[in-house]
Amino acid sequence: MAAATLRTPTQGTVTFEDVAVHFSWEEWGLLDEAQRCLYRDVMLENLALLTSLDVHHQKQHLGEKHFRSNVGRALFVKTCTFHVSGEPSTCREVGKDFLAKLGFLHQQAAHTGEQSNSKSDGGAISHRGKTHYNCGEHTKAFSGKHTLVQQQRTLTTERCYICSECGKSFSKSYSLNDHWRLHTGEKPYECRECGKSFRQSSSLIQHRRVHTAVRPHECDECGKLFSNKSNLIKHRRVHTGERPYECSECGKSFSQRSALLQHRGVHTGERPYECSECGKFFTYHSSLIKHQKVHSGSRPYECSECGKSFSQNSSLIEHHRVHTGERPYKCSECGKSFSQRSALLQHRGVHTGERPYECSECGKFFPYSSSLRKHQRVHTGSRPYECSECGKSFTQNSGLIKHRRVHTGEKPYECTECGKSFSHNSSLIKHQRIHSR
């Protein structure tokens, strides 16, 4: 069987037999869908390579090339004739389930002497020396057959590579390989600077900019630079106010997907971040970091007025209001103002009657968590406030303050009627009943 050859002054003979793959009908039936897709891709690549070589052999006639099948009619080209110098490429028989279905070459219906009375969906028509290739439903002029192959692959792309774990499909094998690492946890791309590993090489390339300080992506609003384009996109939402990630439970929107995922824990009750010191769980990672300062004793935020230090900047800001007298949180019901937002939220329970804090011992409800803690000492017997004079202890600090007046003789409560003073407010109230008789 004579084989068409391609020769250049610097290269040896190359025939299609060197790259051809042959299947019988029986063998073809044993292949699964992914294997058939792979076969199709390989044959298209090989055929595209051969047909594109005519650009470098403009005056060479390639002659006739036979494609051989082992048994019967295999699913690839039987006999094809390739011409150069802009002439059309024709195929004398194309397997119906292969290239003919793709509209890749002009198909002649019979290789046994029958005359074709119609053209296939894909063909080549010569007009004034320029070859027009009919690509399925899209008739378009291409500069070469290789361009047609690329167009056909775009139009007929199938997602042949399927993940056996989750069923997700991909058009490229390397895309499946990248995805598979999600299930295996494999991170083959390691940073030589810090040892951090990544699933994809592109992620490693972006990460390296942390060490090299390369920040090629600039915000056109404020000039801030970013190492990754994705970070720039997130940053731009600061200027646009865009919040594309909305909670389906409460409608609250977020500028970043990670913030939405963390927020969902509010509704699900999920607290995935555990303190290794005390075992307490938190909804947000940032909350865990703040909490851990309780154990470390770190108090980096110091008040410039009195020198008191705090573990969190937010606590310092709230403390400053003690010195400034600022009370920015105002109750819309009664107009009472508070220095802390949490105090306002608790105060609202006075108007709504809401008592969300329940004692697990007796079932009594309280509007404030602080009130619940004080009450629970009734059940535990805890008396943390001790008098330094006599050693008597109390469940609440207010009880200790009142008791100290026994030792100091202080009587801050004065009767407006007769001027008599009392150490306790309750004693003054009782006394005032004498005047009201």
From Swiss-Prot:
Question: Can you say where in the cell this protein is located?
Answer: Nucleus
State which residue ranges cross the membrane: none
Show the GO cellular component annotation of the record.
Answer: nucleus
List, alphabetically, the InterPro entries matched.
KRAB, KRAB_dom_sf, Znf_C2H2_sf, Znf_C2H2_type
What start-end ranges are recorded for coiled-coil regions in this protein?
Answer: none
**Where is the KRAB domain positioned along the sequence?**
14-88
Q: What is its main location?
A: nucleus
A molecular function annotated in GO for this UniProt entry is: DNA-binding transcription factor activity, RNA polymerase II-specific
Similarity comment text for this entry: Belongs to the krueppel C2H2-type zinc-finger protein family.
Instruction: Kindly provide the name given to this protein in its UniProt entry.
Output: Zinc finger protein 154
